[in-house]
Structure formats: structure tokens, C-alpha cells
UniProtKB/Swiss-Prot annotation:
Site residues (Involved in opening and closing mechanism of the pentameric structure), renumbered to this chain: H22, H51
Molecular functions per Gene Ontology: channel activity
Keyword Transport on entry: yes
Gene: SH
Main location as per UniProt: virion
Post-translational modification: Four species of SH have been detected in infected cell cytoplasm: a 7.5 kDa non-glycosylated form (SH0), a 13-15 kDa form that contains one or two N-linked carbohydrate side chains of the high-mannose type (SHg), a 21-30 kDa polylactosaminoglycan-modified form of the protein (SHp), and the isoform generated by alternative translational initiation. Of these different forms, SH0 is by far the most abundant protein detected during virus infection. Tyrosine phosphorylated.
Record protein name field: Small hydrophobic protein
Region (Interaction with small-molecule inhibitor): 38-43
């Protein structure tokens, strides 16, 4: 019976720290993934030639 009480006490002390560390690591990993995705999308928009032309062509048609 002493072993079960020790494990329950250890798990009750350990569980909040585990969930807090898990939440912090997931938030940090999500921020890293989102920043990498935004950097990739910005580079794709810079190298895409048709990205700027789609905004310029309707203005040219309206002016003429």
C-alpha cells in the first residue's frame, strides 16, 4: 500500500509540470512552424512574376 501512495503522490506533483511543459513546447513549435510558413510564402510572392501583374493589369484597363 505504501508504494501506491508514493506513486499517486508523485504523479499528482508531476502532472501539472508535465502539462505546462507540454503546452509551452507545443506553442513554441507552432510559432516556429507559422514563422517558417510565412517566410516561405513571402519568398514565393517575391519570386512570382504574375503576382504583381494581376494587380497592375486591371488598373491599366481602367485607365485606357
Amino acid at each position: 500500500m505504501e508504494n501506491t501512495s508514493i506513486t499517486i503522490e508523485f504523479s499528482s506533483k508531476f502532472w501539472p509540470y508535465f502539462t505546462l511543459i507540454h503546452m509551452i513546447t507545443t506553442i513554441i513549435s507552432l510559432l516556429i512552424i507559422i514563422s517558417i510558413m510565412t517566410a516561405i510564402l513571402n519568398k514565393l510572392c517575391e519570386y512570382n512574376v504574375f503576382h504583381n501583374k494581376t494587380f497592375e493589369l486591371p488598373r491599366a484597363r481602367v485607365n485606357t
